[in-house]
Amino acid sequence: MRFELTFRNLEASDAIKAYAQDKLAKLDKYLRPPAEAHVAFSMERRLHCVDVSVHEAGVHYQGRAEEQDMYASIDAVVDKLLRQLHRNRDQNHNHRRGPQADEGPRE
């Protein structure tokens, strides 16, 4: 996955970049290549905000988290994206499976 990291209203930190890339790497097993992630880190009032947009083969996933700690924000937004990916995968899987067949005639 290709990452694009943007920092608004705060200094760029190598530790935050590495942590975000490590956490977002968990999404790779659910995405088809080529996938891109646009991550924006910002500070609003006293909250650390993380916005993530993930694009893959015509599908777009987006998440936003605001927490007191930047690392907690990253964890929260990754959890949101994982839920979206699971939901999409389950919907596609169930759609392809088709309707369940009846067990047989009832007597």
What is each stretch, according to the model?
Residues 1-107:
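N-terminal, polar/charged subdomain of small-to-medium soluble alpha/beta proteins
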